[in-house]
Amino acid sequence: MTLDRKIDAAIKLLQSIPTDEGTIEVCYSGGKDSDVILELAKMAGINYRAIYKNTTIDPRGTMQHVREMGVEVVQPKENFLNLVRRKGMPSRFVRFCCEILKEYPILPRAVLGIRRNESRKRAERYKEPELCRVYSGGTKVRQYLPILEWSNDDVKEFVEERKIKCAPVYYDKDGNFDVNRRLGCVGCPLADKKARRAEYLENPKMLLAQVKALQDYYDKRIAAGAASSTCVTCGGNAWVFFYASLFYDSFAKFKDKCTNLLFEFDIEAYMKDYFKIKL
């Protein structure tokens, strides 16, 4: 299917959304796909509210881009660092951050920039451009996915044809748009380790803030006599946690290789030097 036909199909889907329950939410993350669905919503002429749920850990320049796009900003009840102080760092298997910071309902009908092309998991999970999601507490939201079948090439062509300005993370030093780049929470455990290291290199102050927040969590757990297995493995040291999670495939492998070296190798100094952290 050509891009023009995909655009027509997307606009028809948006225009078909019932308005009996009021304004339609355009779920805006600041990423390239949300820029595309925002532009499509404008082209479709629907009554919408573009809403950005501030995760408090998006890359530098994201918030400025959100405001430049005229998108409404909703602040979380609790920011990410406070969550870490209370619950520790999220993992691939325990992602409490998503539910609390961005995956919560606002309006009963919502448009999302999900694409099956993004990952095998999404391709398996999303089969149709319309679905009903039930959130914790029983709240139901009808979700619409107008670019579900779009490829990266489709997104790139649409962005360039419509002259859409995307977030800074999508441009190289010469100002060229790179559709393969991603915008997500800095340090997200779902990203691969190389990508996470690159994100922290771009945002070293955020890494330092997360280390301090995790250290607060460890200190409280240790004082209460309730240290987690990960805390014990890391010797109650948040720098060790980040070193292990960013440079090793698992904490088990880190433990096997480095337990006897913890006090011979200054991990904190290494991390500060690697990520160019200046106090």
What are the roles of these predicted feature ranges?
Residues G22-T23, A167, Y171-L279:
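ATP/NTP-dependent adenylation/nucleotidyl-transfer catalytic domains that generate, transfer
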Residues M1-R162, L279:
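ATP-dependent adenylation/nucleotidyltransferase module used to activate substrates
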